[in-house]
Amino acid sequence: MYTLELLLKGNPAPIVVHQKEEEAANRAYQSIVNALQSGSPQSLELTCDRTGKKVFLLTGELCGVQMTSKSGSASPMGTRPGFLAQLQS
């Protein structure tokens, strides 16, 4: 299972979307990065494979995205990987 965490401007809680396949997660991640790099707001619709829920958002409200893979081992001392761990400190 792969997790995409989308950070919104002015919102401390990320939007989390789960993808079962690595290829699907990479495609979704790359489409978000491309939309952010384009500089003009675009609309994105993502579907969570775990819950089946959909989210529709404007890239102008995004300030970051992180992709992680769910492994069998827990992260050290209960911290989350990547830049979100620093926000919680």
From Swiss-Prot:
Region listing for Disordered, in residue ranges: 69-89
Chain coiled-coil ranges: none
InterPro entries: UPF0367
Disulfide partners: none
Domain of life: Bacteria
Family: Belongs to the UPF0367 family.
Protein name: UPF0367 protein CYB_2632
Native organism: Synechococcus sp. (strain JA-2-3B'a(2-13))
